[in-house]
Amino acid sequence: MRPLIVTYAWLLTRLPEAFARLNAALLGQILWLIRGKVIRRNLSKAFPDKDAEWVLRIGRISCRRTAEMGLFSIASPLMSEVEIRDRIVVDESILSPEHGLPPKGTGAVLFVPHFALMEMMTAAPLLRPELAKREWVVVYRPLDQPAAERWVKEARERFGMKLASRREGFARSMKAVREGHVAAILFDQTTQSGSIWQFLGAPCAVTELPGIIAQRFKCPSRIFWADRTDFWRCRLRMEALHATDSIGLTIESNAWLEQKLRSGDDACANWLWAHDRWKHGQHPFKKLGE
């Protein structure tokens, strides 16, 4: 399997970018055929005032951008540092006193939304020396295919970030924050545990994990996301969360995401609508805050 991955990565990085764009379009269409029913349902429930044409357009763009993100994971190990720097911009917000990372020695919890090109966020330590002065621990879900998992994990850890599977992620994230480092955790994935909260007008299961860590160590919390600007190009941004308890942070981060998805079609299409965040919304979990 690995030789096939290497060959495909070589083609993606050596041929004109039109080849990668075409592959993203084709794979996005396949994803739409597989997950289109879920995507249409999610978008229709979240935006009941939008017509079927809008749902179809946003859903298909979201699929293409999801495929684009996956292809970057495959291709990036063969990209030079110069090319990575050319494609990714660090926004001033990441280095600002108000919204950026706190000074070295102070831990931080980063709430990460599942936007297109979030894979490019792993290059942050390469792009600015200030961001490489501390350890980054990122909680993730390993891929099922061993060869693909090794390739993608190596790509994600290439510039210094350390990945921790969900099984060990809580302990390693706690340790990182306690020692003054950074823990990055997806807060908007489907979860089979957690609490129930309204998101885009419907109940869904939300994780309190990042909020629990931030509350435990009384550390700053930030939204950290990749703002897509073009194919395989983005601007990394950060925004401060102001709540200090786990419930407040969970509510605030989800409210931030809801506002972002409602802010325009481009931002809406950047989210991973193919995952069914509302799948467990009717399960007998406790309501957030109870």
Description of each model-found segment:
Residues 1-112, 117, 149-154, 160:
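Membrane-anchoring hydrophobic helices of lipid-metabolizing enzymes
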Residues 31, 60, 100-103, 127, ...:
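Non-catalytic C-terminal accessory region of glycerolipid acyltransferases
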Residues 37, 142-146, 204-207:
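Active-site metal-coordination segments of metallo-dependent hydrolases
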Residues 40-41, 122, 153, 211, ...:
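Short glycine-/small-residue-rich flexible loop motifs, especially phosphate/cofactor-binding loops
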Residues 52, 163, 246-247:
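Flexible, glycine- and charge-enriched loops at secondary-structure boundaries
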Residues 87-91, 145, 163-167, 203-204:
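A conditional alpha-helix N-cap/helix-loop micro-motif detector
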Residues 106-166, 192-195, 228:
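Catalytic core of membrane glycerolipid acyltransferases/transacylases, capturing the structured
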